[in-house]
Amino acid sequence: MSIFSRRLQVPLPYVIAGFFIALIAIFVLASHLFTDKTWFGKEGLLWLFALGAVPGLVVALAQFILNWVEFGEISRIKRLGVQNMLLTRDDPNYYGKYMGQARQKINVMGVTSARFFQDFADVESPLERKKILLAALDRNVQVKILIPSSKHLQERHKEGFRVTKERCQRLKKEYPSLFDARLFDHEAVQALVQIDNEVIVGPVFPNKESKNTPVIHVSAESVFAQSYLDNFESEWNAAAPIDEE
């Protein structure tokens, strides 16, 4: 019969509440049947029940308060649009899963972005995950690269700048209406990657590799992200084409 193949779906809170009600009912029934104590007498069943239940209720209340405070803190962070925090930026898989789903734009701001091209635009690699940026361009995703001019780079970054410039020039020729790269006229102070509605941003320290610095992942619609995105647009509008250097 079809009735035996049906599944009954019950919300978990109802199951938990029903379990405790049944447990209390069993306790009350057992106390009434297997003891000679009355409910309201001196040290009766009600007193024994309260003596056992009150400490548990106090502990449960304390735990509830702690959880409520923690929930409030998490909610406050969520309202800021924070989705994740990473100790380092050296995880191409984290960026790659969003870039593989990009439909509108990818904006990148950093020191040289050499590692970005190595991870996602390696035309010689047989691995598709190394060509995620190229696949995004093939899907008509707009890509902007914004880095400082070479005169604002330390000597150890000059080679990375040269490689990035060559790759940007090649991509600009292949995707003239989709790809663009520009240079701003000061040292880099932040690293930013925007992939549609996802923004991953962090600081740039002069004497520390950017891949080893922390970042925060937020929604592009959040107030937190808006300042960084406004700064990117301002820097982009004032920057010079990478071909001019």
Task: Name what the model sees in each region.
Residues 1-22:
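Juxtamembrane interface helix immediately N-terminal to a transmembrane segment
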Residues 18-28, 54-57, 106:
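Hydrophobic alpha-helical transmembrane segments of multi-pass integral membrane proteins
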Residues 27-38:
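Juxtamembrane "helix-exit" motif on the non-cytosolic side of transmembrane helices
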Residues 38-76:
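Transmembrane alpha-helices and immediately adjacent membrane-cytoplasm interface residues
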Residues 42, 206-245:
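Signature of lipid phosphatidyltransferase scaffolds
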Residues 65-153, 234, 241:
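PLD-like (HKD) phosphodiesterase/transphosphatidyltransferase domain
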Residues 148-190:
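HKD-type phospholipase D/PLD-like phosphodiesterase module
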Residues 180-220:
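HKD (HxKxxxxD) catalytic microenvironment of the phospholipase D
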